[in-house]
């Protein structure tokens, strides 16, 4: 098949988010078979992703999300700050945070193998699809899932994420309690303290001495 229609190219671009010329080449190679063209684009994207996996992902987003009494603080890295501001990348980070809250994965590898929140693919498969569009190395760096009275804080566009857990007999929706939690979160974001109080430091030192 030598030619493909503009409508076919647009359909493939809409389905994959890939550029016009790449979609045209894939359709020509696939003899106009739309499903085969999608597969070809995915295979080429995965090959490129493997080549770029060693590139440093120094930018990214930290997010902190609470739903009910369960929360997640998450860091996902990408190569450039320009790509970090991409709406689809931001949506991916938000969906991954929801996945952590909903499924409680044991670690990053388990998270990547889990079906992503609101989708029909795993987190890893969704990341691979996003790579085909953005063409930058992305890394789910770390996450922490917590339960209890939680107060989240995200600094700026996501350069810092903080989750504060409060132990209190006061109702979880008490405005003064939440304001105190917010103040603590702001302090953590500003100062990056190594421990909660002096007792925590002494406990850590004692444990190290015992070893």
Language model features: what each stretch is:
Residues 206-211:
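A short, hydrophobic C-terminal helix/tail in secreted or cell-surface proteins
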Residues 2-205:
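N-terminal assembly/interaction segments in proteins that build large macromolecular machines
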């Amino acid at each position: 098949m030598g030619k493909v229609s503009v409508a076919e190219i647009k359909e493939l671009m809409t389905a994959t988010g890939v550029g016009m010329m790449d979609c045209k080449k894939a359709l020509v190679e696939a003899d106009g078979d739309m499903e085969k063209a999608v597969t070809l684009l995915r295979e080429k994207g995965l090959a490129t992703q493997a080549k770029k996996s060693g590139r440093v992902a120094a930018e990214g987003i930290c997010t902190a999300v609470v739903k009910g009494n369960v929360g997640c603080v998450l860091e996902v890295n990408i190569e450039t700050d320009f790509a970090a501001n991409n709406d689809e990348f931001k949506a991916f980070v938000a969906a991954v945070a929801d996945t952590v809250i909903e499924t409680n994965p044991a670690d990053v590898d388990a998270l990547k193998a889990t079906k992503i929140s609101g989708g029909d693919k795993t987190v890893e498969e969704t990341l691979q699809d996003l790579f085909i569009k953005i063409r930058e190395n992305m890394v789910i760096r770390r996450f922490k899932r917590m339960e209890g009275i939680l107060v989240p804080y995200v600094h700026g566009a996501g350069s810092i994420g903080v989750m504060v857990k409060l132990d209190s007999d006061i109702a979880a929706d008490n405005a003064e309690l939440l304001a105190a939690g917010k103040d603590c979160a702001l302090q953590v974001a500003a100062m990056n303290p190594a421990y909660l109080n002096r007792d925590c430091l002494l406990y850590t030192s004692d444990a190290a001495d015992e070893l």
